[in-house]
């Protein structure tokens, strides 16, 4: 659990809680596009994302334990459908400061012209998917047991924090 993932280079930098949540939303989107994008036009990835204490990631060595402290919950990733009306209200125009999203190229091109009655596809975690007020329908689950912290660990191993 405490295995060193990556010793950051001298120019690596601190990541704030906000930056981490934006990055996780982007990683959700990448997973969605890579695994479901051939069959679905995915608008965005993200949802309700919140880090836990210590909230931020300091420059220096990063272990899996560090990431587990930041993102401790075992929320699987889900491809969901949502009406245009709820997509706008709950994700695009939300006033909830805990919702973070990353738009696909397709999503960025249509986000200002969403049809309330159309169906759209998004990639979120199981917490966001199962939160009833979001009114999402789960279409498919990504590999069980892959969580936000795992996506961050893979990103770091690939040199994404340099």
Which residue stretches match the model-derived regions?
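Feature captures C-terminal
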Residues: 18, 22-162
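A conserved active-site cap/scaffold subdomain adjacent to cofactor or substrate pockets
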Residues: 1, 5-23
């Amino acid at each position: 659990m405490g295995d060193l993932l990556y010793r950051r280079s001298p120019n690596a930098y601190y990541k704030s809680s906000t930056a981490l949540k934006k990055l996780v939303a982007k990683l959700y989107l990448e997973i969605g596009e890579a695994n479901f994008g051939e069959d679905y036009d995915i608008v965005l990835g993200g949802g309700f994302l919140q880090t836990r204490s210590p909230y931020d990631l300091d420059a220096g060595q990063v272990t899996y334990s560090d990431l587990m402290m930041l993102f401790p919950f075992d929320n699987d990733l889900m491809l969901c459908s949502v009406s245009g009306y709820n997509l706008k209200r709950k994700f695009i125009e939300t006033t909830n400061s805990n919702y973070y999203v990353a738009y696909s190229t397709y999503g960025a091109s249509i986000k200002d012209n969403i049809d309330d009655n159309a169906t759209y596809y998004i990639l979120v975690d199981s917490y966001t998917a199962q939160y009833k007020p979001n009114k999402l329908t789960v279409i498919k689950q990504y590999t069980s047991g892959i969580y936000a912290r795992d996506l961050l660990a893979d990103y770091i191993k690939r040199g994404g924090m340099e």
